[in-house]
Design a protein with these regions (language model features):
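Short beta-strand or tight-loop elements
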Residues: 42, 56, 103
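Conserved catalytic cores of phosphodiester-cleaving nucleases, focusing on short active-site segments
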Residues: 15, 38, 58-76, 87
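A short acidic/basic microdomain associated with nuclease active sites
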Residues: 34-50
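Basic/aromatic recognition patch in beta-strand/loop cores that engages polyanionic ligands
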Residues: 48, 54-58
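Short solvent-exposed loop/turn micro-motifs enriched in small/polar/acidic residues
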Residues: 52-53, 80
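Solvent-exposed, charged helical/coil patches
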Residues: 1-37, 105-106, 111-122
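Nucleic-acid nuclease catalytic cores
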Residues: 71-117, 122
Length: 122
């Protein structure tokens, strides 16, 4: 996908060792340059029986449909994948990408489709 290609371009240009925020800013620039609609640090509200019980902040949301969670660690661990799935459960987004700007860049794609997604009752 275009997002994954852009991720690898940023990896190749910057290399390993920067803070996540540096990679996030570079990725935002490149995704915008490719004509994608992007927002960063979007608040995701978590609801329990219609009541807001907490908030998450997504690193990047692309075209209001894809949540992109960024890491700059040695490798992806299960807790990162669970975090992404929770973001998907709390939004209308069905696709999530976990991008790790580690020594060896890696990504995971997750899809979460469930009619019982945890959202505020309308």
């Amino acid at each position: 996908s275009l997002i994954i290609k852009t991720f690898y371009e940023v990896c190749n240009e910057l290399g390993y060792g920067f803070l996540k925020k540096v990679y996030q800013n570079a990725l935002l620039i490149e995704l915008k340059n490719r004509g994608l609609q992007v927002s960063s640090n979007e608040k995701i509200k978590v609801y329990y029986k219609g009541e807001n019980v907490g908030d998450y902040y997504a690193d990047i949301i692309v075209n209001n449909t894809i949540i992109v969670e960024l890491k700059a660690t040695e490798f992806i661990v299960e807790a990162f994948e669970n975090q992404l799935l929770n973001y998907l459960r709390g939004t209308d987004c069905k696709v999530g990408l976990l991008l790790n700007f580690g020594k060896k860049p890696e990504f995971k794609r997750r899809v979460f489709e469930n009619k019982r997604k945890i959202r505020k009752n309308h």
